[in-house]
Each structure stands twice: as structure tokens, then as C-alpha cells.
Amino acid sequence: GNTYSANNKQQTDIEQLMPKYNSTFAKMNGNYSYKLIWDDSMVSDALQEAKEQYSTNATFKIRRRKVFIKGDNATMEEKVEGALKYPVLRADKFLRRLLWFTHYACNGYYDTKGGHDVLTVACLYREIDYKNSHY
């Protein structure tokens, strides 16, 4: 018999965090909002970074993987905040040194496939040299 039939819903076990948790990422970077500009064009790069494909070009990066037990009833917002809180705090002196108008984006994914749930998040910060950019 085919054991996969009825239970094999066409639903993925991996949830991408953007765009749904954009405001959560912005909140976690809130101390630096005076100098940072969210850049939608970097969102897919941030996902690649979370997936450990390190080709992304960025001035500074934060990446964190956090494991949750199945049935953890924290909201996804709480999980994302919990995952980013300490990496952002630890990065404070680097984030403060970033140039004004640094572009940034975060992304990640929540994977429920294995015995535990795994949240992986990444934020990329890219300094933009406006002196040499032509519009």
C-alpha cells in the first residue's frame, strides 16, 4: 500500500519569514533605525545567508540558528525576537559604526521537518557609497 496518500498534504515544512515578519525584523534593529534603510532588494540575499550560502556581499552580517521543541507555543514573532536579541546586542559596536543610510534586510526560515523545529535568521547590512553612485 501507499503509506503517503492521505497524509501527504502539498504543504511545505519550511516557512520563509519574509514578508510576514518584516515589522519584527525592523523592531529588532530599532536602536539603529536612525541610520538604517530597509532594502527589499536584499531580502532574497538574506535568505541565502540564512541558508549558509555565503556568497552574499555585505558590510556586516548577523546569523543565528535556534532550536525549539515541537509544540513550543511561543508565537513566531517571539521566536524571531528571541533568536535575534542577543546577536544584535553583541553586534552593537559594529552596528553603531555603520555609515548613515546603510541598507539592510533580514530573512530566514522556520523548518519543522526534523525532530525539533529550527529557526534560522540572518540580517545583512550593506554600506552604500553615495559619493560614487550615479543616478
Swiss-Prot record:
Its main location: secreted. It comes from the Eukaryota. It is found in: Secreted. Keywords: Glycoprotein, Secreted, Signal. One of its GO terms (cellular component) is extracellular region. Glycans are attached at residues 22, 31, 57, 73. Residues 1-5 form the signal peptide. To H.contortus 15 kDa excretory/secretory protein. This is 30 kDa antigenic glycoprotein.
